[in-house]
Amino acid sequence: MPDPLDPSDSSTGLPSDDQVLELLAPEFSRSGVEIESVVVSDGGVAGRPSRIAVVVDSDTPVDLDAVAGLSRTASALLDEADTGWQAYELEITTPGVDRPLTTVAHFRRAHLRLAQIRLTNGEDLLGRIGITHDDGVQVVLRKPIKGTGWTVRDLAFSDIESAVVQVEFNTPNPQELNLAGAAETGGGA
């Protein structure tokens, strides 16, 4: 495991992705967030600053105040561990809406959201993410006959090739939300 205080572990004058993760993960976890990814990039081009970008997520929405608090925490921890690193910009952010859903946690956090899903058999679905289980997820789909009514389909994660949350501008149908488990979890539009 890299030593977060050993500058010889980094050839760029910056901490490595793993060093940043090791430094921040325990404190971020205590704050109820999970680090999704860390990217440390050297500015490369003259005048362009180096950057440490940390993407965080949680089972509850991460608001701007929480991001600001995490940024202060990360800054303090990185400053304390700094052994002569070059200057960098620190960015703490949450995943964008276009992040692919690739883990059980991603599907759980996308509960009640509309998603475009491609199955391994090539079938494309547009449905609302329902209750997530260890091995799969329920998806509420509009019935194909005249597009009226809803049906719930259980999908195994092994059958999902890709899934991405879609931006919605209209309020979801209450019946659709209930079928997706809104009543069970206290969610809704």
Curated annotation (Swiss-Prot):
Cell compartments where the protein resides: Cytoplasm
InterPro entries recorded: Ribosome_maturation_RimP (IPR003728), RimP_N (IPR028989), RimP_N_sf (IPR035956)
Origin: domain of life: Bacteria
Keyword hit for Cytoplasm: yes
Function field: Required for maturation of 30S ribosomal subunits.
Family from the record: Belongs to the RimP family.
PANTHER family per UniProt: RIBOSOME MATURATION FACTOR RIMP
Record-given protein name: Ribosome maturation factor RimP
Organism: Mycobacteroides abscessus (strain ATCC 19977 / DSM 44196 / CCUG 20993 / CIP 104536 / JCM 13569 / NCTC 13031 / TMC 1543 / L948) (Mycobacterium abscessus)
